[in-house]
Structures are given as structure tokens and as C-alpha cells.
Amino acid sequence: MAEEQAYHVNKGLECIKSLKASPPDLSTIKDALESWREGLSPSGRATPNPDTSEGDHQNINQSCSPAIGSDKVDMSPEDNLGFREITCNDSEAGLGGVLDKGSNSQVQRYYVYSHGGEEIEGLEDADSLVVQANPPVTDTFNGGEDGSDDSDVDSGPDDPGRDPLYDRGSAAGNDVSRSTDVEKLEGDDIQEVLNSQKSKGGRFQGGKILRVPEIPDVKNSRPSAQSIKKGTDGNSVLSGTVTECSSISGATQAVPESRWESSERNASVGSVPKSARSAKTIQGLTQESGTIASLTQPKENDSEFEYEDDLFTEMQEIRASIAKIHDDNKTILSKLDSLLLLKGEIDTIKKQISKQNISISTIEGHLSSIMIAIPGFGKDIKDPTSEVELNPDLRPIISRDSGRALAEVLKKPAVDRSQKSGIKVNSGSKGQLLKDLQLKPVDKQASSAIEFVPSDHESSRSVIRSIIKSSKLNIDHKDYLLDLLNDVKGSKDLKEFHKMLTAILAKQP
């Protein structure tokens, strides 16, 4: 049904635009209608209009020329447009015809429906009976936007036994003049038309076309305002306006911002509604009914205002206390962060101290295993080493039992330390080490750390091979020298080979 309505609305608007663009002459229209009516005789054949035969008579559901004649029906097989000529005495203007495409050419009874769905009996068979609405000439090309609200055809009762195809054909079979029959509906009329369509089973009734109202200008419209005058328990009086909210969604109503400033710190607001848990508690009537729920302001006593002021003050104090606690917590957290840093530094110091303790323990272990040759005291008189002469150059380093190793390295025994202080001791004498403990002089004929002296030993040959391999000579020279070394026999030849090798290496850069 909605598609059919949209189709007819679009067709009507197209006709209106075309007529506005090129309006025909009224005299020409009158002449055409008179000539068309004169061409129809009671006994003649109804000839379709040639101007509309190509476009308007292609479908059964589109408007056609009326048929006026006697009761006899004549069949015209030559007509290629699907029309069968009839003559009928009871033809009336304003009725819509239904084409019966049955194969039987005999006369039979059928029904003709008007735009309102009224059933008309008594007419005989006419496959292409078309009844014209026959509007006045002055109203034929009337504009669609300024069309009359009183339609010529009203929606009649719906026949349950009526074929939907016939109903659709009668609704669509309007002429151009019928498309211009537009009624402007707004507000409650739209709702009534929709309800009537629903109650009639959703069928489209011809004769009225809905017209969507224009969108109102929101910028120029002003919301309704109510004056508010509420005391604030002080000398000043708050005056302003509250605007009715047009929105029905949400649980919080809009409150305008106050333009007045109060010197008081605390002030109660009476225009704000109480909080709601859901939108149903404050949702008013829908906008379709045209009414909006208005805000109600509860009446409160002065004691209640004072109680609310006290609660507000206490809430402010609680919020200030919570903010102070929050700041204190931040300070504590910063201190804890610094403590964590100090803990890390302390752990590092402890590790360093433990390393130093390990080093000191290692040094003490080495010192405990060393016997330092220093003069000592507390020797026994009977000890043969007690008469060893003192060396003035020796000084005690660590307070240990000194002088224990002197008897082992000195020729003379230690001096008796138990002598009286009056006895003079020869301090100029120096102790001498034993020959067995003295180092032997360096032998220049043998290999030492000072110089390498080749011998007829395999170790000497290994040393010479290492010298050749580690040199910067070419590989061929190295191989040649190694072959010569293998051929050398005896210590004398080996010494000569070593001298030659030393001279060659000295010449290398």
C-alpha cells in the first residue's frame, strides 16, 4: 500500500510540475473537450482519445475514455489497444471501469466499482468500460499545491468479497485531474488517516493523497518559558526562566545556567528536579499528542533548606578532608620511593664492605705464612743463637716473635739479650750469610735468562725452531732453514747455525 501511495504521489507531482512549466490555454482545452464530446453519439462507437491512447491506455489500471451508449455490446477485434467498444444507457461520470479479459464474448453480468469501492449492479458485459470523472474545465488543470481540501470522491466501505486486483485498478485509474486532487494534512489529521487505513485492512483508498507538512523553522521558534522566583535564604532573590525540554529520552532534564551571582557561599536550587533511576519516572507524553510534560517544583520548608545547607557544608568538609588525605598519601609515597633508593645504596655499600673483608682476610693469610727475619727478644740464655750480633739496619715491622730465623742464616750466634744494660754491644758488626745459602755466580757457558747458549740437547733445537717459525721471513726461507737445522750435527755446528740465524734476523726490518 505504501508503494502504491508513493507511486501516485510521484505521478501527481510530475503532472503538476509539467502543467506549471507549460500551462495550456483555457480556450484550447474547452474546444478539445467539446469536439471530443460531439464525436460521441448514443449509437456510435466510443473512440479513445488519440493523444492519450499511446501513454494512458497501455495498462488496464490507467484512465481511459468514457463509454456512453445503448445496452447492446459490440466487440471490435481490430482494436490493438485492448479496448472493446460498448454502448450503455446507464453510464455515469465519476465511475471507474474494470476490464474483463475472459475468452468468452457472450454478454454477462459484472460489477463496476467507484473510487470509494461502492458496488453497482445492473450493467451488462463491457470489457473496457471506462467512466470519466468529468471534472469542470476550470478545475481540470488546477495546481496540486493549492488543491481543494474537499475531494469529489471519498473512501467508501471496503467490500470483503472484492478482488484486490479490481481495487488496485480503480485506485490507479485516475486521470491527470485526479492526480491534482491533493489534500494538505497536518497534525492530528495524519494520525487519523493512518488509523483509518489500518482499520480498513491496509488497502489504499483513492481520492486523497497525503501531503507531508513542511519542516518547521527551529531557529526562529522560541521555547516557552515560565518565570521562576525562588528565595535562597538570603537577601538576594534569584529570578530567571526555565525552558521546557522537548526531548523525551534520558533521565536528566536540562537546567539553564543562572546569570545571577550570589555573594553567599551556599545556596539551594529549587528548580532542579530530584534524581530518577530510569527515564520512565520523568518521561511525559509523546510528541505525537502535541503535549510535553512540565516540570513540577516541590514545596519545601525553611528547615529543609537549612538541613540541606548543613549537609552540603558537611559534604564540602568531607571532600576537603579526603583531598588532604590524598595529598598526604602522595607525600608518603614519595618518601617511600626515597627510602627504596637509600636501601639500594645501602645494599651496594654492604657488598663493597664484604669484598674488602675478603681481601683483608686473604692478606692476613699470606702474612701469617711469612717468617720475617728481624731481631727478636725473649730468647733463652742457653740457646746458642742468643749471642748473635744485632744488625742496626733491621727494624721490627710487625710485633711478632722476632729473631727466630737469624740463627739459620747468620754465621755468628745471636748476642745474649739478657746482659745488663751496662755492657757495651758492638753495633758495627754485620752478620754474614752462609755459603750454602748464597747464590752462585752466573755461568756464561750455559743458557740463562741473560743469554741463550745452544747445546747438543734437543731442547736447544726446539728453541731454534721456535725462533725460525716466529720470524718474519718468507715461508720458503723458513722451510729452507728448518731443513738445514735438521742436517746440523754437534754442539759446535749448532752454535754456528744459531749465530747465522741471529745475523739474518737482525737484518730484517
Swiss-Prot record:
Residues 146-157 have a biased composition (Acidic residues). One of its GO terms (molecular function) is RNA binding. Residues 459-509 are annotated as: Interaction with the nucleocapsid (N-RNA). Coiled coil: none annotated. InterPro entries: P/V_Pprotein_paramyxoviral, Paramyxo_P/V_N, RNA_pol_Pprot-P_XD_paramyxovir. Keywords: Phosphoprotein, Viral RNA replication. SUPFAM superfamilies: Phosphoprotein XD domain. Residues 178-187 have a biased composition (Basic and acidic residues). Residues 33-84, 131-236, 256-281 are annotated as: Disordered. Phosphorylation on serines by host CK2 is necessary for the formation of viral factories. The N-terminus consists of a long intrinsically disordered tail. The central part contains the coiled-coil multimerization domain (PMD). Forms a four-stranded coiled coil structure. The C-terminus constitutes the alpha-helical domain that binds to the nucleocapsid (N-RNA complex). This is Phosphoprotein.
